[in-house]
Amino acid sequence: MLKTLLAVIAAGLIFTANAATLFGTAIDKTAAIPVEQLLVQPASYLDKVVTISGKIDSVCSKQGCWMKFTANSEQGPFRIKVRDGDMVFPLSAKGKTAYATGTVRLWPQGEDEADAYQLYPTAVEIAD
């Protein structure tokens, strides 16, 4: 009996350790484009719904209200932003692969800086 219980607990831990963290609805990962592809011509995606994939570079340490995908471009990293409390991204997500579906919008910068782009997601999946 004890061996069976331990086996069930071990199996549960293995499956839980590899489970993705999902915010919002399920994501169609087959439609995902790499964040670098979006950043080649971000204006062409403005106000459109897209699904992107990338590695998480950083996460908001105060309220978990944004995270940034690593991007090898002049515009990177690329920010994923939600209203405070809508989704709370865990600090442990840093370095993991993620997928996000949402609308690309302008992100106003300072007076002497060009505006950047960010994604307002309806769904996010932190995969590994």
Region roles according to the model:
Residues 4-13:
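Sec-dependent N-terminal signal peptides
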